Amino acid sequence: MKNNRILALSGNDIFSGGGLSADLATYTLNGLHGFVAVTCLTALTEKGFEVFPTDDTIFQHELDSLRDVEFAGIKIGLLPTVSVAEKALDFIKQRPGVPVVLDPVLVCKETHDVAVSELCQELIRFFPHVSVITPNLPEAELLAGQEIKTLEDMKAAAQKLHDLGAPAVIIKGGNRLSQDKAVDVFYDGQNFTVLENPVIQGQNAGAGCTFASSIASHLLKGDDLLSAVESSKAFVYRAIAQADQYGIRQYEANQNN
């Protein structure tokens, strides 16, 4: 592996369970050199958990600083505004052939500050330029414009997102379809794969970030997409099992591998 440089375009979780903390921890555990362009800051205020987007000019300066860095993989997380998303899209368009994993964060668990309706259409523009998208079930509903109540609904939504331009889709169903199983659906444009794990009760902040950054790490190292997804799901499952009140624990998950 000659080039182990991998980038995360993601926000800062003040409690370090998700966002860039999860991305960098996952990259480190995979032996990779992680870079970050920060899309937003977060804080717990009297209003609740708030997201503060990075100023457009500052975010562009971040990306300009990385213009000459040769990345072998990119993971995209929370893009809090359309303007930040536009700049991120321009950045990845300049890197054809680099594996890109898009975690299309549209609904934060803690807040509705993200402008969901505007970001939907902007994120769809990313689809032809990424390797795989990893929406959770509510995000898949918004992007596909349909309700998802059954496994067949998940498959139909994955097909629709593929038709919108995503080469591959994995919808993270969590325990919405089953109380005792976490069910995900992976679609590569030809075949569906259903992935299941027993549900672990407790804090899972950072699970989606870790999942996407783990997939990006495995793609960089040469794994095929399905293998990357399966390995990443297993890793996240172990990390959730080690979670504390601030989120999942990547390092402990790796030690218990």
Question: Which stretches of residues belong to each language-model region?
Answer:
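Conserved phosphate/ATP/ADP-binding segment of small-molecule kinases
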Residues: 115-191
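Conserved N-terminal subdomain of the carbohydrate kinase-like
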Residues: 2-8, 20-109, 256-257
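Phosphate-handling active-site elements
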Residues: 31-35, 192-193, 218-231
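Charged C-terminal helix
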Residues: 53, 226-257
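Short, small-residue alpha-helix embedded
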Residues: 141-142, 201-225
